């Protein structure tokens, strides 16, 4: 059975060899990995992946409570995921979560609750039946090699055992479902008690066990319980007394900012009709029997008006109820107080009203309208009035009646914790509960207990006046003196309080003036510092501007100097070029004249030679004279050569004048040195003319 191979009926593939099964077959534990879960195949049948069984056999039929759906059923086939929240109940085949191969049920919200039913435990579904979006059980060769020991024959044998186990576990699953529901209720209550604002990700949770019971509940599977993230835990629990108080304080502060402006003109308060079922119409009914019902109380008070809410404490035999209007409450009190019911005398009184507050330490400029508007920020007000004497003088106190007890409690708390001012004066209003006695009937005779011994002793003597100097007169006078002392001390205390108030008022005004003066000084110092800072900034900007201006001037001056030097150089270059051009033109002219002169000088030399030696000498002299005269010209270009000894007519010295003229004429040229023989005649063939090109006469 271990090495049996399932053959492919299509005949398209040959069976693959199987490895021997190991004794300790390890399940596929890919829990908590980021990659997709590999398919745990029991045996490869050689067919395509679509035709193979998706899930291997479940080798562990033990309870899957630890990994299954949040304590959902054990047994062979594990529980389905519970709805609601993000429970990831990843119950795999080998974890006892889902029977016969354990489909991976990932519950991500109530609309994706894919439960596995009992008929899915036969492992005959194709891979298309399972949700593919989870990336759950994919083909992997390595996982196939590791888990090839689980054959289909073994899975068939175990499937039959699982069906039997499911039938046995189904009854247990029902009991576990009830237990789990109770556990979830306790977990939710605990989560609400802990004000941890975590999102509720728990599943709905049902029973685990046979064929798709509930998982997920109470944070099962991979639902990591973080604070109140239990199964079906309810949202963000941001309630609580502190949060409620903070919310009330926030809205009170908002309403206070809206009226923080001047209160010179306030509209008059419309006198509204009496509020129905107000706190002033609440009656206390005592000495009742413990068998009385609300219907009997309504029938008892029905002739006197409409009855509102009723609060009964039958253990202590008393009841609180509200009548529609105050006049009807008075009628009911007078009629039913002292009446008998089942052998007991009823006691009917007005209940203490916790919505009425006494406001004292008010300035004389606080009116009914200002008092109403100031205390309206705490909640709706039924009545607000200033207490005055018979002449209409302000007594420095008033009464505020709220519509709700919560508003009165908030007002009392905030005014005691902080200083609440109504005007510009720094006298905070003092708020305290006020006990209002609306009982105008007093104490009738029927309300007294005449069975007491003290009653009989006190009533034994009637009204009388004491005689002077008698025992009764002496002690009666002492009682009067005691009350007079109390009254005098009370008056003295009031006068002292008045003086202290005036003193504190003067100190307050002086301190206010000093504070305003100090604030003005601080403002002045601040402005002076700002002015000094602005002055320093202005000076810095001026300095920077001056430095920039100097840099710009220096740059401009440097540019101008460079431009001037450039212009001078350009002018010098231009003048030199002009002189060179002029000299070049003159040199060309002299060259042309020289060519002409050389032509004439050659003819003269020929004639002299024909005349003999003397004539030759004369002719040579004449020739030399012409040439030398040409060379002595101030425009001669041959001055640029060294050794040019110019001689005048027949070898005579030209004299210093000619030499000076030649030097002045060629002063601009520094190409060579003018060596002129100025001393005596030089006669000969050359005629004293040492020209560089060595022209000789024969």
Swiss-Prot record:
Coiled-coil boundaries: 484-582
Compositionally biased region (Basic and acidic residues): 518-561
Compositional bias of kind Gly residues: 61-86, 201-220, 228-242, 599-623
GO biological process: visual perception
Composition bias type Low complexity, residue spans: 108-126, 145-197, 624-636, 643-660
Region (Disordered): 1-247, 515-571, 597-698
Domain of life: Eukaryota
All residue ranges annotated as the RRM domain in the record: 281-353, 355-441
InterPro entries: NOPS, Nucleotide-bd_a/b_plait_sf, RBD_domain_sf, RRM_dom
One GO molecular-function entry: RNA binding
Record keywords, A-Z: Coiled coil, Repeat, RNA-binding, Sensory transduction, Vision
Ranges of Polar residues composition bias in the record: 1-29
Function field: Required for normal vision and courtship behavior in Drosophila.
Protein known as: Protein no-on-transient A
Origin species: Drosophila littoralis
Upper classification of the organism: Eukaryota, Metazoa, Ecdysozoa, Arthropoda, Hexapoda
The gene coding this protein: nonA
